[in-house]
From Swiss-Prot:
Its EC number is 6.3.2.2. Homodimer. GO terms for molecular function: ATP binding; glutamate-cysteine ligase activity. The keyword ATP-binding applies. This is Putative glutamate--cysteine ligase 2. The keyword ATP-binding applies. It comes from Salmonella choleraesuis (strain SC-B67). Pfam families: GCS2. Coiled coil: none annotated. GO terms for biological process: modified amino acid biosynthetic process. It catalyses: L-cysteine + L-glutamate + ATP = gamma-L-glutamyl-L-cysteine + ADP + phosphate + H(+). Keywords: ATP-binding, Ligase, Nucleotide-binding.
Length: 372
């Protein structure tokens, strides 16, 4: 199968996708009513898109192409208002978080959609288990070769993005001991983790052609890599973040990725090499397991450093780019988060340690998303 040409887009433009939990009070389990909710909101939207994602307990909010985080925030805020209004009318709740803390995957209904039904046929129960919730950020690129360079550059910071956004410590009623348990769900997929090594767009087109021989890949959307190029949009898509509990944090994460992309493409601080990925999965695991307390290991020198410290260094490096893009508020907020030493997974555990229940935790998450 031939790959589409890379669509030229304005560099550093943004698109944000948020996979939201549709909740059924008073049990605060996942609902199976996303279709009802989506039908109720479609006519009310003025910008962006609201659509299905895998199962009937998931709802995806997606912005259009945005020039900066302020425009993205305005679109997401408008969608949030419409969704919350419709959810209230249908006695449903909406919240973020990378996993629902006590839902049972066996109860999840895959959407009546040709693509998702085909995916269910290919992957079986793994698709129902993939009822987890992430934030994806698209960044515009001028051409395919820039997209491949950007993908490799951003891959250096996958642990940082995971640790900052980690919000999935609980699954199936248990504390997983992970800050981000969501990404473990995809470990059984044949395309889990980093994209196979290529050095330019021509090589990527050849890779995609060979992957299509498996009969499991019909489009880029069928690839579950941590970061992937999206030629139809002319973007690189970062896919490792848990959906945050607040819109503000989602915007901050998008601002960081946009600023990092600008820094990478203007400064070119790395010469991508295949060996860069030698310890990729080990460092990724550290971020998932321990969050900002994880330890990164340099694939070349063996040097080890705290993820929190390296994240502060990243934030310092991208600050000039953030100022140019109007994303400096995002960098400031994330710097404060790192210095305080926490993420949303830590907040969730503190809620339970203070005597809260998992049902109460989901209720609290719905209240947080609704701004209560």
């Amino acid at each position: 199968m031939a790959l589409n040409d890379f669509h030229v887009s304005e560099p550093y433009t943004l698109g944000i996708e948020l996979e939201m939990q549709v909740i059924n009070p008073p049990s605060y389990d996942l609902s199976q009513d996303s279709s009802t909710l989506i039908d109720a909101v479609k006519s009310r939207l003025t910008a962006g898109e609201i659509k299905h994602d895998i199962t009937e307990s998931m709802l995806e909010m997606a912005t259009g192409v945005c020039r900066d985080i302020d425009q993205a925030a305005a679109q997401l805020s408008a969608m949030q208002h419409v969704i919350l209004q419709a959810a209230s009318e249908h006695h449903l709740g909406i919240c973020g978080g990378g996993t629902h803390p006590f839902q049972k995957w066996q109860r999840q209904e895959v959407c009546d959609n040709e693509r998702y039904q085909r995916t269910l046929e290919n992957f079986g129960y793994l698709i129902q288990q993939a009822t987890v919730f992430g934030q994806h950020v698209h960044v515009g690129c001028a051409n395919g070769d820039d997209a491949i360079y950007l993908l490799h550059g951003l891959s250096h910071f996958v642990p940082h993005f995971i640790a900052l956004s980690a919000a999935s410590p609980y699954m199936q009623g248990s504390d997983t001991r992970f800050a981000c348990a969501r990404l473990n769900i995809f470990s059984a997929f044949p395309d889990n983790g980093p994209m196979p090594w290529v050095s330019n767009w021509q090589e990527f087109a050849g890779l995609f052609r060979r992957l299509s021989y498996t009969t499991m890949i019909d489009s880029i959307k069928d690839l579950h890599w941590d970061i992937r190029p999206s030629p139809a949009f002319g973007t690189v898509e970062v896919r490792v973040m848990d959906t945050p509990l607040t819109l503000d944090h989602a915007i901050n994460m998008a601002g960081l990725i946009q600023a990092t992309a600008h820094w990478l493409l203007t400064e070119r601080p790395f010469k991508p090499q295949e060996q860069d990925y030698l310890l990729y999965k080990f460092n990724r695991f550290q971020a998932c397991r321990y969050g900002l307390e994880g330890v990164l290991t340099d694939a070349y020198t063996g040097d080890r450093r705290r993820l929190a410290d390296d994240t502060l260094r990243l934030l310092d490096n991208v600050t000039p780019s953030a100022r140019k893009l109007g994303a400096d508020s995002a960098i400031d907020a994330l710097r404060l988060q790192v210095k305080k030493g926490g993420n949303e997974a830590q907040y969730m555990r503190e809620f339970i340690a203070d005597g809260g229940s998992l049902i109460g935790l989901v209720q609290k998450h719905c209240e947080i998303w609704a701004g209560q």
